[in-house]
């Protein structure tokens, strides 16, 4: 299976495949790294909520672990990637609930919950528009604040993108932060569409790395 081939390629290039026992460290890392990220500020009604973000990351990690590939730069966990396979259309409701989604609803309220649900529907529709869900989906690239500027993102991305080049695969991502766009363009992604998250002023860039 291709998932196993990618995992082998990542390991061969010195990357670390994340275990569930690493999740709490990644959650803490994310809570600091995503401070003031525009989409998360929007989710929580205009003010960044670190605990809310950490719980959202927790839900994502547990929901995506079995089907996706979660890997880090090393066992030091300076940065990590969540990569999801072709055919991904969003977190299934049962998985969301089972892995802590009710905490978000209870603690963040129905408005924040609805913003997240509506955003995922919007994002998945845009992904399907450009890839027909045949893409490997780079759901998350996160580097700790302390390790930013130390080429951790390059260490995480280059082996993966080399695999896609060799095997003529497409990789899709989105970002909601203007300064991230040239970083991804440097890695070979191209902007397919720039728009706004519905009912907000948050930018949304759909980007593709296409080797077909």
Place the predicted regions along the sequence by residue:
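A short beta-loop-alpha structural element at the N-terminal edge
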Residues: 14-28, 36
């Amino acid at each position: 299976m291709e998932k196993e081939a990618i995992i082998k390629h990542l390991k061969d290039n010195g990357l670390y495949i994340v275990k569930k026992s690493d999740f709490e460290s990644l959650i803490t890392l994310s809570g600091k790294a995503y401070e003031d990220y525009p989409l998360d500020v929007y989710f929580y009604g205009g003010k960044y909520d670190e605990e809310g973000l950490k719980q959202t990351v927790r839900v994502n990690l547990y929901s995506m672990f079995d089907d996706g590939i979660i890997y880090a730069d090393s066992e030091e966990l300076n940065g990590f990637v969540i990569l999801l396979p072709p055919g991904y259309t969003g977190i299934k409701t049962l998985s969301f609930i089972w892995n802590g989604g009710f905490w978000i609803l209870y603690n963040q309220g129905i408005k924040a919950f609805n913003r997240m649900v509506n955003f995922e529907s919007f994002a998945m529709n845009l992904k399907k528009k450009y890839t027909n869900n045949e893409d490997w989906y780079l759901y998350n690239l996160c580097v700790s604040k302390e390790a930013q500027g130390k080429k951790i993102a390059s260490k995480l991305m280059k082996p993966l993108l080399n695999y896609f080049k060799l095997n003529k695969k497409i990789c899709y991502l989105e970002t909601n932060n203007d300064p991230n766009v040239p970083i991804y363009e440097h890695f070979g992604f191209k902007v397919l569409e720039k728009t706004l998250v519905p009912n907000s002023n948050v930018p949304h860039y759909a980007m593709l790395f296409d080797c077909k």
